[in-house]
A protein has these predicted regions:
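ATP-binding glycine-rich loop module of kinase domains
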Residues: 62-121
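Protein kinase-like catalytic core scaffold
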Residues: 84, 128, 144, 223, ...
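Catalytic activation segment of kinase domains across protein kinase-like and atypical kinase folds
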Residues: 223-250
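ATP-binding glycine-rich phosphate-binding loop
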Residues: 3-81, 89-91
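Conserved hydrophobic "DFG−1" position in protein kinase catalytic cores
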Residues: 77-78, 148, 234
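Conserved structural core of kinase catalytic domains
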Residues: 124-206
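Protein kinase catalytic-loop region centered on the HRD/HxD motif
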Residues: 214-222
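Active-site Asp-x-Gly
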Residues: 100, 171, 182, 245-250
């Protein structure tokens, strides 16, 4: 799946509108200070939270757009156009927690995703990832298109739970007729889920995939991490895919 010229034109128009309304250019962390009984607390607050309310009325009314963000990138979604979402990278001016490259330049986490998707294609496991491509650049900001995938945390968590329960069954002395024992069993499952590493989460979701070992190796080699339930989604053709796979260099 690759974006068409019409898809790229749509994304370009949206980005032009964002800049025209000073939306993206203001997407920067501002240092704030709060006072409490013990003294002062310095923290950073992303203005995106404010703009989501201040600006979203215009963009939702005129374009049907919804805005989401993580630590490293922003995502712009039109739920009436469920083919692609627009992703824009954050840098240290957006989030001071983002690390720089060794040469001092900011890390483009969206570019990392596009590069890793290309390598996944070369490995023949691209169906496990939401397709990601660079779409253009405006005012020095590159933007990207990623295959639309609907996040369903409950479904992904169910996969984690099923996998974890099978593992816990191997060592837990379970008594299904003992209510207290069953409660302890369920607690042990959730503890197991909380301790699962990213490769285990991949196995939980892609357990029937013929290339599961190759996928796990790819996840490890590419430093793909933080695969919690909100970083998965379901594409229009029903595939469950990873939607945030740049890896976080915090």
């Amino acid at each position: 799946m690759k974006p068409t010229i019409a898809d790229i034109e749509w994304a370009t128009n949206i980005m032009n509108e964002l800049f025209a309304h000073n939306f993206y250019t203001a997407l920067r962390y501002e240092e704030r200070t709060s006072t409490y009984s013990g003294g002062e607390n310095h923290y950073y607050e992303l203005g995106f939270d404010e703009w989501e309310y201040a600006e979203s009325g215009y963009f939702r009314e005129n374009y049907g757009l919804h805005f989401y963000r993580g630590e490293t990138k922003g995502c712009i979604v039109d739920f009436n156009r469920q083919e692609w979402v627009i992703k824009v990278p954050f840098d240290r001016s957006t989030n001071p927690k983002c690390r720089r490259n060794e040469d001092g330049t900011s890390i483009d986490y969206c570019a990392l995703e596009a590069e890793k998707y290309a390598r996944a294609c070369a490995e023949g496991i691209e169906e496990c990832f939401a397709a990601t491509y660079e779409a253009g650049e405006i005012n020095g900001v590159k933007f990207y298109l990623q295959e639309f995938a609907n996040v369903d945390e409950d479904s992904t968590t169910d996969s984690f739970y099923e996998y974890a329960s099978e593992q816990v069954e191997n060592y837990f002395n379970r008594d299904e007729e003992d209510e207290g024992n069953e409660e302890l069993f369920r607690e042990e499952i959730w503890d197991f889920i909380n301790d699962m590493d990213d490769q285990e989460r991949v196995i939980a979701v892609f357990n029937d995939h013929k290339n599961i070992r190759k996928i796990c190796d790819f996840i490890y080699d590419e430093d793909i991490n933080d695969l919690h339930s909100a970083n998965w989604g379901f594409t229009n053709d029903g595939r469950e895919v990873i939607i945030d796979y740049s890896g976080y260099k915090g």
